[in-house]
Amino acid sequence: MSDSPAPLADPHLVYDPVAGDGPKDVVVLGSTGSIGTQAIDLVLRNPDRFRVTALSANGGRVALLAEQAYRLKARTVAVAREDVVPALREALTAQYGTGEPLPEILAGPEAATQLAASDCHTVLNGITGSIGLAPTLAALEAGRTLALANKESLIVGGPLVKALAKPGQIIPVDSEHAALFQALAAGTRADVRKLVVTASGGPFRGRTRDELAAVTVEDALAHPTWAMGPVITINSATLVNKGLEVIEAHLLYDIPFDRIEVVVHPQSYVHSMVEYTDGSTLAHATPPDMGGPIAVGLGWPERVPDAAPAFDWSKASTWEFFPLDNEAFPSVDLARHVGQLAGTAPAVFNAANEECVEAFRSGALPFLGIMETVTRVVEEHGTPRTGTSLTVADVLEAETWARARARQLAAQTAEARA
């Protein structure tokens, strides 16, 4: 991948090597979520490599946030919800003891963005949703290495991220993109024939579109492989998550959409593959566990020993691969479409999907109604203007419209079903 210009994520480049033998200072955004809690577990097991200086969370789990701050000796904690500050201060006092100095507390919608620009080596953005865009931009602008688990910020603000990021500054934390990142180290970008992104197929692999009509929220939340938050789990059930990952792969590695393939791999052992022009394919494989991708994001270019379990190759196992059923799961094709449209189209796609997932969880939309509504919102948005630079204001305006329109359409569907 030595071609010029370099892609956003390049395993051949190290943006900011650590001087000396001391641990890296890390800020963890979304510390009480799935990625955040696993990252903190990794840090606690490797105090010689990493030191967490600050934590942020939405504010729904203040007891856990306080425990994390105490165990990590974090200097600052931040919550998006200002109303939970008294409860957070009480939880911190319970951890530290009366009379002991507490970490600095930041609160409000900009708190995570403030932390992203604070003094540290690496920012791990583990926030869920497009609200992670501002912290992503802040970390890049401040010159921090960005371990990116918040795929939505790249998807909705691709041109903005690309304008700020320096070569090698972004390390992907998604399991699929961390896998591609490592497999791409074997050659140059000119050597790459295609990227192959694997999908477990979710809980409804093998079902026809008609069979998906009766899917319930409980069904959709029962992912066969990964333990994730409810939004990402439902995105995996619709395969929207895989569509977002296709857009992300295009933006990270500068590979055209027609050279990014999705295949279903139920075992989730192979996380992605790179096919090279000489006919060889390099696959990255581990048992399903986010410890490895998180360790790559925080530790690259070094390997973190025992970050994740390894295979026992003495035991027989079956590894299967199947083509994706685009009729039953149209989300990947729709994601390719909006990715090629570019501009504000990916932001509209993502925002509409977030609203439709909430509508499905509340009972307003049926399972198939998620993608039907998202498709309609994307179609109504039309083709973004070309020849103009995307701004944060453009993204926010498009998201606001898409959310309002998705809610309106979901309400109409709920009324018709009543």
UniProtKB/Swiss-Prot annotation:
NADPH binds at residues 32-35, 150, 152, 229. Its EC number is 1.1.1.267. 1-deoxy-D-xylulose 5-phosphate binds at residues 151, 175-176, 200, 223, 236, 241-242, 245. It holds the Pfam family DXPR_C. It comes from Streptomyces coelicolor (strain ATCC BAA-471 / A3(2) / M145). This is 1-deoxy-D-xylulose 5-phosphate reductoisomerase. Catalyzes the NADPH-dependent rearrangement and reduction of 1-deoxy-D-xylulose-5-phosphate (DXP) to 2-C-methyl-D-erythritol 4-phosphate (MEP). Keywords: Isoprene biosynthesis, Manganese, Metal-binding, NADP, Oxidoreductase. It catalyses: 2-C-methyl-D-erythritol 4-phosphate + NADP(+) = 1-deoxy-D-xylulose 5-phosphate + NADPH + H(+). GO terms for biological process: isopentenyl diphosphate biosynthetic process, methylerythritol 4-phosphate pathway involved in terpenoid biosynthetic process. It comes from the Bacteria. Mn(2+) binds at residues 174, 176, 245. Signal peptide: none annotated. Pathway: Isoprenoid biosynthesis; isopentenyl diphosphate biosynthesis via DXP pathway; isopentenyl diphosphate from 1-deoxy-D-xylulose 5-phosphate: step 1/6. GO terms for molecular function: 1-deoxy-D-xylulose-5-phosphate reductoisomerase activity; manganese ion binding; NADPH binding. Its cofactor is Mg(2+); Mn(2+). The keyword Manganese applies. NCBIfam families: Dxr. Belongs to the DXR family. PANTHER family: 1-DEOXY-D-XYLULOSE 5-PHOSPHATE REDUCTOISOMERASE, 1-DEOXY-D-XYLULOSE 5-PHOSPHATE REDUCTOISOMERASE, CHLOROPLASTIC.
